[in-house]
Amino acid sequence: CKNVTIKGIIIDDSNDWSMRITGCDDVNISDVKIFGCRGNSDGIDICGSRNVTVSDIFTRVWDDSFVVKALGTGNCENIIFKNSVLWNDFARTMEVGVELRADKVRNIKFENIDIIHSDTGYPLMGIHHGDHARVSDITFKNIRIEDAPGAQLFDIRIADSVWNRDKAMGDIRNITFSDIEYIGTNDSGILLSNS
């Protein structure tokens, strides 16, 4: 698909990933509200797509809110998630991975995001990689976190998992975290690993 606009919709109680954009170019998603209470009810998954802007989103989901993956449908490049509010009952709020089956996953930005709830031990900002892609130029900027008892602030790792298919593992480089503010009452642990 090319030149796609998705605006002003509500997705309620999906039984799988609520919105999956796969193998597309030049996509704009805005003013979307997503409510999911089932396992696997991700918010928005951008998979092997290029030039995608996701803005002004509210998610309250049981699984991951914003995810970038590459499922063998081409490189994933120039993706921005911005100006959004995330509530997670389980899993990750912002994630690059786990499935990264492409040559390049690069220039991915998460900017001006409010995390208002996440009460599991999962990382709020994660990069999990076990396939062959070169992952680079990932930015988490201007992120505000309200309460996230037990959550990890961020987790970056290269490791094998049940979701990976490639035998060779790629690398991760040029990751930026800036203007991250935690205003909750819980001291979250911080995990950085490269396994």
Regions found by a protein language model. Name each.
Residues C1-K33:
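Internal alpha/beta core interface subdomains
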Residues V4-K7, V27-D31, N51-S55, C76-K82, ...:
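All-beta strand scaffolds that present successive hydrophobic residues in beta-strands
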Residues I9-I10, I57-F58, V85, H129, ...:
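Non-cytosolic beta-sheet module surface loops
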Residues S14, V68, G74, I80-K82, ...:
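Conserved beta-strand/loop scaffold segments within soluble protein domains that form the structured core
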Residues N15-I21, C37-C47, N51, T59-A70, ...:
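Short glycine/acidic-rich loop motifs that flank beta-strands on beta-rich extracellular proteins
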Residues G23, K33, A70-G72, V98-L100, ...:
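Active-site-proximal loop/turn and secondary-structure-junction residues that shape catalytic pockets
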Residues S118-S195:
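Extracellular beta-rich repeat passengers
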